[in-house]
């Protein structure tokens, strides 16, 4: 039984639901806070995620970062050497989706020379009547960037665990591949 630790960067524009997603995941869906204050720096959420069919687990250290450019210099230091990325946008806000490429580029610049596993999460699907980003468009963009794609409604507690379970599985797979490389060298 192996317990791995992974630094997970939670990135995206302000008010897309990053903090709500992290908090609801940490509490296993037990607590949805109706109002949030703007994250002005970085919040840290830690949760252990079992990897199915292995007996192993990944402890995700989820760095919930401010979505404002104002804090970007601070983010550079806090984002150093991430292991996985959770990129969040609001399905009712096309600009938040369009800005995902900027957030992805920023995260990847903090992990030069390595493959950074990640997911794209469209949040606020409960606001279907106000949807501005087509699911197929988001999925195609994510695929083109090497990201898995999910949609969720944190408010309705729908599919909020899947992105993090996927990240844990991706990180565990990288670990297994490295173990195999070392075994081949022995």
UniProtKB/Swiss-Prot annotation:
Record annotation: effect of changing residue 100 to Y: In BBS19; loss-of-function mutation; results in significantly reduced protein levels
Phylogenetic classification of the source organism: Eukaryota, Metazoa, Chordata, Craniata, Vertebrata
Subcellular location per the Swiss-Prot or TrEMBL entry: Cell projection, Cilium; Cytoplasm; Cell projection, Cilium, Flagellum
Any one GO biological process: cochlea development
Family matches, as Pfam families: Ras (PF00071)
Disease: Bardet-Biedl syndrome 19: A syndrome characterized by usually severe pigmentary retinopathy, early-onset obesity, polydactyly, hypogenitalism, renal malformation and intellectual disability. Secondary features include diabetes mellitus, hypertension and congenital heart disease. Bardet-Biedl syndrome inheritance is autosomal recessive, but three mutated alleles (two at one locus, and a third at a second locus) may be required for clinical manifestation of some forms of the disease.
Binding site for GTP: 12-19, 64-68, 123-126
Species per Swiss-Prot/TrEMBL record: Homo sapiens
Keyword Protein transport: yes
GO molecular function per UniProt: GTP binding; GTPase activity
Record's subunit section: Component of the IFT complex B, at least composed of IFT20, IFT25, IFT27, IFT52, IFT57, IFT74, IFT81, IFT88 and TRAF3IP1. Interacts with IFT25. Interacts with IFT70B. Interacts with RABL2/RABL2A; binding is equal in the presence of GTP or GDP. Interacts with ARL6; recognizes and binds with the GTP-free form of ARL6.
Family to which the UniProt record says this protein belongs: Belongs to the small GTPase superfamily. Rab family.
Keywords associated with the record: Bardet-Biedl syndrome, Cell projection, Ciliopathy, Cilium, Cytoplasm, Differentiation, Disease variant, Flagellum, GTP-binding, Nucleotide-binding, Obesity, Protein transport, Spermatogenesis, Transport
Chain's role: Small GTPase-like component of the intraflagellar transport (IFT) complex B that promotes the exit of the BBSome complex from cilia via its interaction with ARL6. Not involved in entry of the BBSome complex into cilium. Prevents aggregation of GTP-free ARL6. Required for hedgehog signaling. Forms a subcomplex within the IFT complex B with IFT25. Its role in intraflagellar transport is mainly seen in tissues rich in ciliated cells such as kidney and testis. Essential for male fertility, spermiogenesis and sperm flagella formation. Plays a role in the early development of the kidney.
Name this protein carries in UniProt: Intraflagellar transport protein 27 homolog
GO cellular component: a single term: Golgi apparatus
InterPro entries in UniProt: P-loop_NTPase, Rab_GTPases_membrane_traffic, RabL4_euk, Small_GTP-bd, Small_GTPase
NCBIfam families recorded: small_GTP
């Amino acid at each position: 039984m192996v317990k791995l630790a992974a630094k997970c960067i939670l990135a995206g524009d302000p008010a897309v639901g990053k903090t709500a997603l992290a908090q609801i995941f940490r509490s296993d869906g037990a607590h949805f806070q109706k109002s949030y204050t703007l994250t002005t720096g970085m919040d840290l959420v830690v949760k252990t995620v079992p990897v199915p069919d292995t007996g192993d687990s990944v402890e995700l250290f989820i760095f919930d970062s401010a979505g404002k450019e104002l804090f970007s210099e601070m983010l550079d230091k806090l984002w150093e050497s991430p292991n996985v990325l959770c990129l969040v946008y609001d399905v009712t806000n096309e600009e938040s989706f369009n800005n995902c490429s900027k957030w992805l580029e920023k995260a990847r610049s903090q992990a030069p020379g390595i493959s950074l596993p990640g997911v794209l999460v469209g949040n606020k699907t409960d606001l279907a009547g106000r949807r501005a980003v087509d699911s197929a468009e988001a999925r195609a963009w994510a695929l083109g960037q090497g990201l898995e794609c999910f949609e969720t409604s944190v408010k309705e507690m729908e599919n909020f665990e899947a992105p993090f379970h996927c990240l844990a599985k991706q990180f565990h797979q990288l670990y297994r591949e490295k173990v195999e490389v070392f075994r081949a060298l022995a």
